[in-house]
UniProtKB/Swiss-Prot annotation:
Name used for this protein in its record: Bifunctional protein FolD
GO cellular component: cytosol
Positions that bind NADP(+): 154-156, 181, 222
Pathway(s): One-carbon metabolism; tetrahydrofolate interconversion
Quaternary structure (record): Homodimer.
Family: Belongs to the tetrahydrofolate dehydrogenase/cyclohydrolase family.
Any Gene Ontology biological process: tetrahydrofolate interconversion
Keywords: Amino-acid biosynthesis, Histidine biosynthesis, Hydrolase, Methionine biosynthesis, Multifunctional enzyme, NADP, One-carbon metabolism, Oxidoreductase, Purine biosynthesis
Length: 271
């Protein structure tokens, strides 16, 4: 069975439009990149389309050198007309910590800044990483979280690690196991889970023999192949369990949450 995230998307959309109407000025999101590959360019175009759909301002800045990128970030961080900054990653030839040194946490609407991740650990975050938050929203909408046995396959700083922290919060109280591609006997761990989150970046990693019948499988993977974009979950798993689609699942919710974070930043800046 395919999990339809459209009702959740529409709920977020309705609430977001109401918040935008209350603003006195139009929020602005700026994407910063350096030597983007075709897939990055394609993603930025879809991001721009999403921003325009909500009547939000959007601009792309492309640095001409690694130092140029850092200079752009520092300038945008000081610009009171900019509410959110999105940095494409990985950013070729640019050290990630140098990026964060030049990016003010209050405009890091992706929630990737060490300050924001640290606040997340204390349950005091202003921004959570968008993809991790998208997974939580889908889980809350589909199954409810307290007491659930959740296995996360993936340990990235943007999904696996922050998602584990978010699910362990007292108001969610999931039992969380974090695995990765080096985990031995992975199927013996995923088999007993109520929810499996596939976020390892490996096409078809999760197969039908690895999951419980009617369990929830959230596919975070985005893998570009000759067949198109596919996730980390084999297609036949949907005949046995409930699976989010790729594309049109987690990514759809992630994008609208990025816009929600932008509006949240604008509200804080009294726009």
């Amino acid at each position: 069975m395919i999990i339809d995230v459209k009702p959740l998307y529409e709920d977020i959309k309705v609430n977001l439009l109401k918040r935008i109407e209350k603003l006195k000025r139009t929020p602005k999101l700026v994407a910063v990149t350096f030597k983007p590959d075709p897939s990055t360019v394609s993603y930025l175009k879809s991001q721009e389309k999403a921003a325009k759909r909500f009547g939000l301002d959007y601009e792309i800045f492309e640095g001409n050198s690694p130092k140029g990128v850092l200079k752009i970030l520092a300038e945008l961080s000081r610009d009171n007309n900019v509410n959110g900054i999105f940095v494409t990653h990985p950013l070729s030839q640019v050290n990630e910590m140098e990026i964060f040194e030049n990016l003010v946490p209050s405009k890091d609407i992706e929630g990737r800044h060490p300050y924001n991740l640290g606040m997340l650990a204390y349950g005091e975050e202003f921004f959570a990483p968008c993809t991790a938050e998208a997974v939580v929203r889908i889980m809350e909408n589909e199954i409810g979280i307290p007491g659930k046995n959740v296995v996360i396959v993936g340990r990235s700083n943007t999904v696996g690690k922050p998602l584990a922290i978010m699910l362990l919060r007292r108001d969610r109280s999931a039992t969380v196991t974090v695995c990765h591609t080096k985990t031995r006997n992975l199927s013996s761990i995923t088999k007993g889970a109520d929810v499996v989150v596939a976020a390892a970046g490996r096409p078809g990693l999760i197969t039908v023999d690895m999951v419980e019948k009617d369990s929830i499988i959230i596919d975070v993977g985005i893998n570009v192949t000759d067949e198109g974009i596919i996730g980390d979950v084999s297609k036949d798993v949907a005949n046995f369990a409930k699976v989010t689609p790729v594309p049109g699942g987690v990514g759809k919710i992630t994008t609208i949450l990025l816009m929600e974070h932008l509006v949240k930043s604008a509200e804080k800046m009294n726009f």
